[in-house]
Amino acid sequence: MSRLFKITALVPSLSRTRTQRELQNTYFTKLVPYENWFREQQRIQKAGGKIIKVELATGKQGTNAGLQ
């Protein structure tokens, strides 16, 4: 069973804007596997977004820190 992070993020949506001053934000929550976490984090930040919350969705807490 792989570890999954449940992330909540806010990304500006450029496709739905009618004027230059108006900016719509897309708010979403998704599950990201531990292996893809860094890539997903980079993607959100490059798009000008903000990561609001990160939780461990599955897997044992502290596994990566060597705790049993």
Swiss-Prot record:
One matching Pfam family is: CpcD
Question: Gene3D superfamilies of this UniProt entry?
Answer: Allophycocyanin linker chain (domain)
Q: Where does this chain mainly localize?
A: membrane
Q: Which Gene Ontology cellular-component terms appear in the entry?
A: phycobilisome; plasma membrane-derived thylakoid membrane
* Keyword flag Lyase: no
- Where, per UniProt, does this protein localize? Cellular thylakoid membrane
Q: Where is the CpcD-like domain?
A: 2-57
Regarding the membrane, this protein is recorded as: Peripheral membrane protein
Task: Share an example GO biological-process annotation for this protein.
Answer: photosynthesis
The answer to whether keyword Membrane applies is yes
Key words, A-Z: Antenna complex, Membrane, Photosynthesis, Phycobilisome, Thylakoid
Q: What's this chain's function? A: Rod linker protein, associated with allophycocyanin. Linker polypeptides determine the state of aggregation and the location of the disk-shaped phycobiliprotein units within the phycobilisome and modulate their spectroscopic properties in order to mediate a directed and optimal energy transfer.
Q: Which family does it belong to?
A: Belongs to the phycobilisome linker protein family.
Q: What is this protein called?
A: Phycobilisome 7.8 kDa linker polypeptide, allophycocyanin-associated, core
